[in-house]
Amino acid sequence: MRSENILQILMESKYTVAMCGIQMLFENGYPGLRDGDVSYDIEQKYGYSAEEILSSTFYATRKELFFDFYKKEMLEPTKIPPGKGFINLQKLEEYGLVQAEITRRLFGLLDRAGCKHAINMHGSVYENFCTHCGKEYSMEYIMEAEGIPLCQECKNPVRPKICLFGEMVDNGIVTKAAEEIQKADVLLVLGTGLHAALCHQLIQYYTGDKLILVTNEEHFSDKLANVLIYSRVDDALEKIVKAYQKKIKEKQKMEKIGHE
């Protein structure tokens, strides 16, 4: 389907929600810590898998190694700014074509791109708190701390406000995401599959008939989408944004002619 046709669907929509998957991270240059060579390198370097280290049990029992891994493998990549996929999604929000974004990714790329209505299901590395008194800390505080970051007030550990493996996702956040999807007449699934965890958990709440899937990986569940685009997400969103900008310029030109 042409970008102009997708744009028309978005322009006719009263409420569109975007669900953003891991492919958008990869397109942005972020590593897949549980994939292929990267996963192997992590096990060789730390003696454990990323999933083991980023668990509630590991955090409770091996904080020193947890934070060594966390600073190097989770915080270092944040030096990479949001790429054109996230920037163009923010533009669609700004144009009133997308009303909310939902992701399970932890790097805050939607917020950093300027999206005002992002729901970070599993939290963000940019939010941290003292496990004892609740005092909040920046990501920079975690990064600059030697070893285990400690609260300036009570000297207890400061931990990232993210959902570790073995922890339950905050029920309030799940409810908020479900409510957004229930309101949607268009669901824009970007860079993930309908079988993946993000969709599997939330897609049951969508009651519309305009599910648009943009992905670069084929899967048999793709047939459940009403509109299917095999493409990089950043390329697809860029085309939609350009189509909208072209449409607006043409409209402004016609209005100018009408006033002459």
PLM feature spans:
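Conserved catalytic core of sirtuin-type NAD+-dependent deacylases
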Residues: 1-260
